[in-house]
Amino acid sequence: MTPSRHENGLEFDEVSGSVTAVLESAPLRPFADPVMSFLGALSTAIMKDRDSRRMPDLVSFGYWCRRANLERMAGRYVFDAPVVGRGLAFHVPPTNVPLNFAYSLVCGLLSGNGNILRMSSVDAIEVRKAIALIDSVLAREEHKAVRDMVCIVRYGHDDRVSAYFSGLANVRIIWGGDATVLHMRSLPTGPRTVDVAFADRTSLALINAAHVSKSSEDELRADAERFYVDGYTFSQNACSSPRMVVWAGDERSVADAKARFWPAVDAVALKRGEIEPIHSMNRLVELCQTLVATNVVTDVHGIQSASARVSISDVTRWQEIASLRFGTFTEATVRNPRDIERLLDQKVQTLGVMGFGSDVLSRIAESAARGGVDRVVPVGAALN
């Protein structure tokens, strides 16, 4: 880590790369081959690293940025004319999802931009490992072009430094919730600077109870695996991680579905062995704090299992306790899937769905669109 002082007296640490090099770099076209080659090499390095295998979030990132996946992603974009990145992207990642900075960086690189990322002071082991692997791959001579497009900086809560980078940026990628977004927007930027902001959002899943009740053991296990990916990756910190599970069906079918589904999810969690004791403790602490601070919780089930379920007195108030994490899910029931609309608003990012036919899915999508939801995806694809 190299302490730096600019001529205007601003101080920050260059954790990786050089600010000067990034400022002097030229933008590339989207999905440029040097970037694709670097990310493919990074994916390989992560997947082969022995320490990384004990860090499921890092392994997930490495798998996501493998070249074959990025090639599929590139195939979704068709450009009618030659295009290049906007220039410099200044990233302000969140603190609650440690490896989010890596995903943000990949997006900046794939869009052809030079990137300066502000890292938080949170010293997570997977962040240190990720940066070390990024550095090791960038150090290879064949990746010099990409090396000059990446700089990771760290500094305290200093608006002067944030304003400095904001003034240089052509794009700002701002994570961290409403307060962070509003604060960053109060800082001066160039007249053509574009902000990509991720404000406070939450997500939920809608599950067809009859589908779960009638599924085979293999189908149930596969559904539980898909739900686990959405609900437990990043310790339920991602905006697209479901915080609420809404069951569609009559009282009996919902009861039968719950009795099958949650033990299957617990079995997946036990098999994967990724839930640490500290996660269980944090879940209990957060739940107790919620019970003290609100009057909406009426019952809690499965607190000693991998999946704690919370019942509330008024399901329309579910977002009041949407900060619960580490495998804690508010539950609600609707008889008709379209009734989900009363639980949706513009703070809902993702609605995951499971077990519905195409006709019902179309009606659900219409309800979600009216509610202001960004997207409707199959359970298991919420983090894509």
Residue ranges of predicted features:
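Short, surface-exposed connector motifs at secondary-structure boundaries
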Residues: 113-116, 145, 164-171, 344-350
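Short, surface-exposed basic-aromatic patches at helix termini and helix-loop junctions that form
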Residues: 107-110, 136, 186-191, 368-369
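N-terminal Rossmann-like NAD(P)+-binding subdomain of aldehyde/semialdehyde dehydrogenases
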Residues: 1-87, 377
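Short His-Asn-centered micro-motif
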Residues: 92-95, 119-120, 153-155, 174-177, ...
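Conserved small-residue-rich beta-alpha loop and adjacent elements
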Residues: 74-138
